[in-house]
């Protein structure tokens, strides 16, 4: 079963790792998920956390000072240090087994076709994995480019701004993994709206228009005996 813990607390937050970052005292939502991820949220950033730690990570409590400090540490030794000044709400909830996001038929087929014909992304590209799982959901395709660099690909039937935002979240998360980083992004769709293309380009994400009919007609060796 999936258990999520919600805490609303007056707190300060310090990130200690490759960089350092400090969030001064404020009321915040702390979200602890069953996969081990921890995220810190404010009321003004929609779905985006102020800071977070991806799994695997571990939560311990230091109680030697004036206020308890919740320390979230990952395997790389990076830490989120959350100093708790006061707790207004603390609850845990069973969410059950989530069926996951079900892609429509065209998107699922586009993903399968692009995985099979990965050279459409560029010469020298190789497929690492389909549905590469992250703490916030699966990346459609994880690939390597001609230089061995990591590339995350998000595939849509219609490429809109929310798809670019989704890929941006994946990239922010994947680029915190020292094994994969740096990770580039490709936003692939049958049709990409101008606003989505502008946003993607501004964020350094490459756009790729997919011709579904042409891809369906491409030669496949999947069932070939010779």
From Swiss-Prot:
GO molecular function: DNA binding; single-stranded DNA endodeoxyribonuclease activity
Compartment list: Cytoplasm
Entry's EC annotation: 3.1.-.-
CC annotations in GO: cytoplasm
Keyword annotations from UniProtKB, A to Z: Cytoplasm, DNA-binding, Endonuclease, Hydrolase, Nuclease
Major location (coarse): cytoplasm
Enzyme class: hydrolase
Record-stated family: Belongs to the NucS endonuclease family.
Described function: Cleaves both 3' and 5' ssDNA extremities of branched DNA structures.
PANTHER family recorded: ENDONUCLEASE NUCS (PTHR38814:SF1)
NCBIfam families: PRK03298.1
Official protein name in the record: Endonuclease NucS
């Amino acid at each position: 079963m999936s258990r999520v813990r919600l805490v609303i607390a007056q707190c300060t937050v310090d990130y200690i790792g490759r960089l350092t970052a400090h969030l001064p005292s404020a009321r915040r939502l702390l979200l602890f998920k069953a996969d081990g991820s921890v995220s810190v949220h404010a009321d003004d950033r929609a779905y985006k956390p102020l800071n977070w730690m991806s799994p695997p990570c571990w939560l311990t409590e230091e109680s030697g000072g004036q206020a308890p400090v919740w320390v979230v540490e990952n395997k790389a030794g990076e830490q989120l240090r959350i100093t708790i000044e006061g707790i207004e709400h603390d609850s845990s909830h069973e969410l059950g087994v989530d069926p996951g996001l079900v892609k429509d038929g065209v998107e699922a087929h586009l993903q399968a076709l692009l995985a099979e014909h990965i050279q459409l992304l560029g010469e020298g590209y190789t497929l690492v994995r389909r549905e590469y799982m992250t703490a916030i959901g699966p990346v459609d395709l994880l690939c390597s480019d001609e230089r061995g660099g990591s590339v995350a690909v998000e595939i849509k039937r219609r490429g809109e701004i929310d798809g670019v935002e989704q890929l941006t979240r994946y990239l922010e998360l994947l680029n915190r993994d020292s094994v994969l980083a740096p990770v580039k992004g490709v936003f692939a769709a049958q049709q990409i709206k101008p606003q989505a293309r502008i946003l993607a380009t501004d964020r350094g994400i490459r756009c790729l228009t997919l011709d579904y009919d042409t891809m369906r007609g491409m030669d496949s060796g999947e069932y070939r005996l010779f």
